[in-house]
């Protein structure tokens, strides 16, 4: 099978990482890069002399590109992805797919009609620690999932093109959907623009899933510390996934168990404080 010929659009903040990883990936040939900035294109040409550079991603068709990776500012994702799908190219776009539901649905419909792959860069679905958490949930070790509480906060980086929900929450929401394997019945959110008017820098997102499973996502650009933590509470055990800690996944044998002799309205419980164990994670992706 011949290599997949890839073009990368956008070599700003995140694009160089996309380019570097595709260039090192077996079965992939990066044939072109598009960006509006001459300096960035010169840097790509110096580092990768064999890769064509252009200011216009429409040139990708002439250059024989099969698929594109889009790493441009979020507001440009929809028009660029739409153009590339219309060119007949498979598309990987960094999160978010679009800035509203209508545009996202249009892209999905276009990809389906053209028989093309449209994929969003929800990289945490391929993170070994997250996959380990999913294994634990599916094994039944945690029992019925009562709720998941997720926090992704830090100080900055403020952006004019997106608010904190579009910047950070796609990670947590994609992880939740992956872990639970279902979509929420209801979603609500509230936030605040504390520093710049009309740019929300803190938000709380609430979701209710089938089976009365609740989820809460807290995202913020206005926190003194950086946190990447998800607490999962089940009817049998509890688990913490901490992307910053050395021990990414820790299982807690803890629970509140109503007294068997308790009468209706009696909320006395037996609290089990069992061991906590750091679970091994296979870091081969």
Predicted ranges, named:
Residues 1-48:
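N-terminal Rossmann-like dinucleotide-binding module
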Residues 123, 236-285:
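C-terminal glycine/acidic-rich active-site capping loop/insertion
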Residues 32, 67, 147:
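Short, Asp-centered acidic motifs that coordinate Mg2+ and/or phosphate
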Residues 75, 98-160:
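A contiguous active-site-proximal alpha/beta segment in oxidoreductase catalytic domains
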Residues 173-254, 284:
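Contiguous beta-strand/loop segments that form the cofactor/metal-binding neighborhood of enzyme cores
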Residues 121-128, 153-186, 199-201:
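Mid-domain beta-loop-alpha active-site segment that forms a flexible
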Residues 18, 48-109:
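Beta-loop-alpha module in the N-terminal Rossmann-like domain of NAD(P)-dependent dehydrogenases
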Residues 55, 93, 118-120, 149, ...:
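Hydrophobic residues in well-ordered beta-strands that form the structural core
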């Amino acid at each position: 099978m011949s290599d997949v010929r890839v073009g990368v659009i956008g070599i700003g903040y995140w694009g160089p990482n996309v380019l570097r990883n595709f260039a090192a990936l077996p079965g992939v040939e990066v044939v072109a890069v598009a960006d509006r900035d001459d300096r960035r294109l010169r840097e790509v040409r110096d580092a990768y002399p064999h890769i064509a550079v252009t200011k216009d991603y429409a040139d990708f068709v002439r250059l024989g590109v099969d698929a594109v990776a889009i790493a441009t500012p979020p507001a440009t994702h929809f028009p660029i992805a739409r153009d590339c799908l219309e060119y007949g190219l498979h598309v990987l776009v960094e999160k978010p797919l679009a800035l509203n539901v209508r545009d996202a649905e249009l892209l999905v419909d276009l990809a389906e009609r053209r028989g093309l792959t449209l994929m969003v860069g929800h990289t945490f679905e391929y993170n070994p620690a997250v996959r380990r958490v999913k294994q634990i949930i599916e094994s039944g070790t945690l029992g019925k999932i009562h709720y998941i509480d997720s926090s992704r906060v830090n100080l900055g980086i403020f952006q004019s093109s997106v608010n904190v929900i579009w910047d950070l929450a796609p990670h947590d929401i994609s992880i939740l959907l992956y872990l639970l394997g279902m979509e929420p019945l209801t979603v609500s959110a509230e936030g605040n623009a504390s520093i710049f008017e009309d740019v929300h820098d803190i938000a709380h997102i609430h979701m209710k899933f089938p089976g009365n499973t609740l989820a809460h996502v807290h995202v913020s650009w206005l926190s003194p510390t950086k946190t990447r933590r998800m607490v999962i509470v089940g009817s049998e055990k509890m688990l913490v996934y901490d992307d910053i800690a050395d021990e990414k996944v820790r299982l807690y044998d803890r629970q509140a168990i109503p007294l068997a002799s308790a009468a209706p309205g009696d909320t006395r419980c037996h609290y089990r404080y069992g061991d906590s164990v750091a679970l091994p994670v296979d870091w081969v992706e």
